[in-house]
């Protein structure tokens, strides 16, 4: 309730003028007065004003985070999948589950959908990362398009590169072309250790250096408590060992530009395509997710 103080209500004459109408010598005298009423509003100290509700909190109730271990009741044209790649405002989602009543259910598992993110998720500040398990709606199975309407809870999150639900991190460097830089490798290792997930160090292009240099890096990394893997995408040396380390987990391959990340993914696709679940996940982008069922 608002009250007005009688003492504060003031009536003031702003202007009092005399105006003449008519020609010279025959004017009609009219007096006009203008008044302005002003008052000072006082708040009642006994009344508590309710604060405005937080719009972000209200919107978050419309899209609560889904528990990772629970499956929502899917309706027609909905599906559950994992984000494989992200480019600008578009996400590629690998379908993992569809409604049980959906005809051709088996044919839709593993399909890749090009998706956009629901605007509400952006307004409430909910990030959507590669590796996220998501709920998609309005699926067009012909054009393979859909909309991401919600995100499941995460097990883990990597900040650089931004990716979620990772079990295993592969740090890939090359021994030459470009030559491995100890400072850059240390920075990658420190950031990886802060995540708290399993780490594998792989050194590519071992055919371009001497055996003495390979042994030198093996001794150095072992002194840092890492067991390095040496490989050559060009000669396919050590690829089997890397594939073995990628089994039954979600892995991310990171490293500087030019070390052979894309080449490694391509050779894994071509050599182990029969053992890879959802091989569409392997794309030559800045990071890669792998799903092995060996």
Curated annotation (Swiss-Prot):
Broad class of the protein's primary localization: mitochondrion
InterPro entries in alphabetical order: G_CP_dom, NA-bd_OB-fold, P-loop_NTPase, Ribosome_biogen_GTPase_RsgA, RsgA_GTPase_dom
Record keyword NAD present: no
Transit peptide range per the UniProt entry: 1-68
GO MF term list: GTP binding; GTPase activity
Domain CP-type G, residue spans: 155-294
Keyword terms, alphabetized: GTP-binding, Mitochondrion, Nucleotide-binding, Transit peptide
Family of the protein in this entry: Belongs to the TRAFAC class YlqF/YawG GTPase family.
PANTHER family per UniProt: SMALL RIBOSOMAL SUBUNIT BIOGENESIS GTPASE RSGA, SMALL RIBOSOMAL SUBUNIT BIOGENESIS GTPASE RSGA 1, MITOCHONDRIAL-RELATED
Protein name, as recorded: Small ribosomal subunit biogenesis GTPase RsgA 2, mitochondrial
Upper taxonomic lineage: Eukaryota, Viridiplantae, Streptophyta, Embryophyta, Tracheophyta
């Amino acid at each position: 309730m608002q009250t007005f103080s009688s003492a504060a209500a003031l009536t003031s004459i702003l202007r009092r003028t005399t105006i003449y109408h008519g020609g010279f010598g025959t004017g009609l005298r009219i007096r006009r007065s203008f008044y302005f009423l002003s008052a000072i509003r006082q708040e009642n100290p006994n009344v508590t004003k309710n604060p405005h509700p937080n719009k972000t909190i209200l919107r978050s109730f419309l899209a609560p985070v889904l528990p990772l271990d629970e499956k929502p009741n899917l309706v027609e044209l909905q599906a559950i999948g994992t984000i494989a790649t992200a480019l600008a405002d578009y996400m590629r989602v690998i379908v993992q589950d569809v409604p049980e009543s959906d005809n051709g259910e088996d044919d839709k598992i593993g399909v890749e959908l090009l998706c956009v993110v629901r605007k509400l998720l952006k307004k409430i500040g909910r990030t959507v990362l590669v590796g996220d398990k998501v709920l998609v709606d309005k699926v067009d199975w012909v054009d393979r398009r859909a909309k991401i309407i919600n995100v499941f809870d995460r097990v883990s999150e990597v900040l650089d590169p931004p990716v979620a639900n990772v079990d295993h991190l592969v740090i890939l460097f090359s021994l030459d072309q470009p030559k491995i830089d100890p400072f850059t490798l240390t920075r990658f290792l420190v950031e990886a250790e802060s995540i708290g997930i399993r780490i594998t160090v792989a050194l590519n292009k071992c055919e371009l250096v001497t055996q003495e240099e390979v042994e030198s890096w093996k001794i150095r990394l072992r002194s840092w408590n890492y067991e390095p893997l040496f490989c050559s995408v060009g000669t396919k040396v050590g690829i089997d060992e890397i594939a073995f380390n990628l089994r039954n987990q979600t892995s991310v391959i990171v490293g500087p530009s030019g070390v052979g990340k894309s080449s490694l993914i391509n050779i894994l696709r071509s050599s182990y395509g029969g053992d890879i679940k959802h091989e569409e996940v392997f794309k030559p982008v800045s990071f890669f997710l792998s799903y092995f069922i060996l």
